[in-house]
Amino acid sequence: MAQIQHQGQNANGGVAVPGAAAAEAAAAAAGAAAAAAGAAQQGTTSLYVGDLDATVTDSQLFEAFTQAGQVVSVRVCRDMTTRRSLGYGYVNYATPQDASRALNELNFMALNGRAIRVMYSVRDPSLRKSGVGNIFIKNLDKSIDHKALHETFSAFGPILSCKVAVDPSGQSKGYGFVQYDTDEAAQGAIDKLNGMLLNDKQVYVGPFVHKLQRDPSGEKVKFTNVYVKNLSESLSDEELNKVFGEFGVTTSCVIMRDGEGKSKGFGFVNFENSDDAARAVDALNGKTFDDKEWFVGKAQKKSERETELKQKFEQSLKEAADKSQGSNLYVKNLDESVTDDKLREHFAPFGTITSCKVMRDPSGVSRGSGFVAFSTPEEATRAITEMNGKMIVTKPLYVALAQRKEDRKARLQAQFSQMRPVNMPPAVGPRMQMYPPGGPPMGQQLFYGQGPPAMIPQPGFGYQQQLVPGMRPGGSPMPNFFMPMMQQGQQQQQQQQQQQRPGGGRRGALPQPQQPSPMMQQQMHPRGRMYRYPQRDVNTMPGPTQNMLSVPYDVSSGGGVHHRDSPTSQPVPIVALATRLANAAPEQQRTMLGENLYPLVEQLEPESAAKVTGMLLEMDQTEVLHLLESPEALKAKVTEAMDVLRSVAQQQAGGAADQLASLSLGDNIVP
């Protein structure tokens, strides 16, 4: 641990912390340990492991962390293209207590000759980037590493993250960061350690300030070169120098002119002293000379000026968005004949419209969408209630609050992240995971418990020999985990009928299902919704439908299974589909939309069609109808959904869900 010293106590530059301070630090450490113990009871089971050597493998990480408890999954994150290690990974434990033990015992352990950093995994990026409890330490001695810094600052509270910045060779850059779980702990460390001596060097300890926020909160920038504009054409260099010379000695003064010698209306004045330049800016900015108001400020490089203008522009956009929050509406699925005036006419009964516009391409053709801004959020709410889904000309409108693209993408990403599966309990014996009607939850990979080696799955599920690639040797097919599972008595009756049918053969016979075990029954509750396959309307399927899984299985065809390329339903015109939706039960509406949407999505993203379709079905019906009618809108939404899926996959790499995905049999099941 680095030696903490008071500044200037003796000839050696400092002395050890006195007894009272040491007692106070010990008390703080005890409090921190208690807080950490309490956090462990409610804490996460997922750990982040950083500073991994490039040669560390998943198996090495597993072996290293197994000594602290039961490990559920491990993952070393790698580049998707080169498969090289990114220098970090994740470890998931069965219990929070095991994770807490690993954090305390394995943090800074050497793995392949390099000390690793272990901390709790924080999935929410807003929490990681919030800056709460984050402090900055600079002027560190080169000998202070991650472990020494952690030991020094752990006396003030539980540490979420601790890091010393290093160069490519591993040498300390002389500064680091420590993040506590609360601002109070961070402030305590700042109060006690700022200005103290660590290894005979006085350190600065203060709140962490984001790079983009450092200039406004830091010291005033010093400058000597002054920019002045809005000058009169008759003003000369000597007159300008005379005005600025009252504030100090100037080294240069020039008015910019064109090729003919005419003034461009601006110039530069350079002072010898920065304080004189600052006083000149404060005194002359906004003053009127020759009936013209001067602008006087610090001379900036082009890049600095562009950055400042960009920040001002973004701030103005944010203020405008905040001002119109809840009152600006987005309208989609507009008929091409709808103009700005017609759109205003339709929405005028609901309140005062401040702006109304139909979006058009460069040639003037309507894009089918627009915006309507009301004076109050209440008026906008009434408009949404009355106009969403209303038929205008020949199309149902989609009306919702307008959102920026970044906000909409963040919302979709947050929704998809919440649908990720939680850690599953360890398997007890061979089992299969079953799902109720509606399919597995959106975004969840299918996981089936694996039996002992060479064990043939228990009977009770039919086989899709045509659909499953990678048949077993000897013609034994992979089991179809999506075959409808009926009650045992009903299945026996159908099997007897099919065996008596001439030419029924193996195609018409279904194996008898066994009663699921209690372990399987516990896993049959739904965790979410995900569209799996387009299928026929359940009302057209003969026979019982209770306790059946939603699959593309046509009972009326004698037990045959649909081929991937065989049509499952005929396309329905949009107007007819909208009418059928209005008359259908709520539980059937999603299926009807999915039957029409899934084939279109599959053409764009065949590998992720199920997930993307499930995401799109979460939207309002009117918007889904618009996607069915507009290939351009569908392509844009599918692209946006794929971006969300990739972003979530990257952020949650190494989690338990990803580990389960790697064990999934989903690749062997054709949607």
UniProtKB/Swiss-Prot annotation:
Composition bias, Low complexity: 483-501, 508-525
Annotated InterPro entries: Nucleotide-bd_a/b_plait_sf (IPR012677), PABP-dom (IPR036053), PABP_1234 (IPR006515), PABP_HYD_C (IPR002004), RBD_domain_sf (IPR035979), RRM2_I_PABPs (IPR045305), RRM_dom (IPR000504), RRM_dom_euk (IPR003954)
Biological process terms in GO annotation: regulation of translation
Major localisation: cytoplasm
PROSITE patterns in UniProt: PABC, RRM
Disruption phenotype: Pab2 and pab8 double mutants show significant growth and development defects and more resistance to Turnip mosaic virus (TuMV).
Subcellular location per the Swiss-Prot or TrEMBL entry: Cytoplasm; Nucleus
SMART domains: PolyA (SM00517), RRM (SM00360), RRM_1 (SM00361)
Induction of the gene: By potyvirus TuMV infection.
UniProt xrefs under CDD domains: RRM2_I_PABPs, RRM3_I_PABPs, RRM4_I_PABPs
Entry's Gene Ontology molecular function annotations: mRNA binding
Annotated Pfam families: MLLE, RRM_1
Annotated region (Disordered), positions in chain: 467-526
Cellular component annotations (GO), alphabetically ordered: cytosol; nucleus
Keywords for the protein's UniProt record, in alphabetical order: Cytoplasm, Host-virus interaction, Nucleus, Repeat, RNA-binding, Translation regulation
Record domain RRM: where: 45-123, 133-210, 224-301, 327-404
Domain PABC: 573-650
tRNA processing found in the keyword field: no
Tissues with expression: Expressed predominantly in immature flowers.
Functional description taken from the UniProt entry: Binds the poly(A) tail of mRNA. Appears to be an important mediator of the multiple roles of the poly(A) tail in mRNA biogenesis, stability and translation. During infection with potyvirus TuMV, acts as a potential integral component of the viral replicase complex that could play an important role in the regulation of potyviral RNA-dependent RNA polymerase (RdRp).
Subunit structure, interactors included: Interacts with ERD15/CID1. Interacts with Turnip mosaic virus (TuMV) VPg-Pro and RNA-dependent RNA polymerase (RdRp).
NCBIfam families: PABP-1234
Further comment: A.thaliana contains 8 PABP genes.
Family according to the record: Belongs to the polyadenylate-binding protein type-1 family.
Descriptive protein name: Polyadenylate-binding protein 8
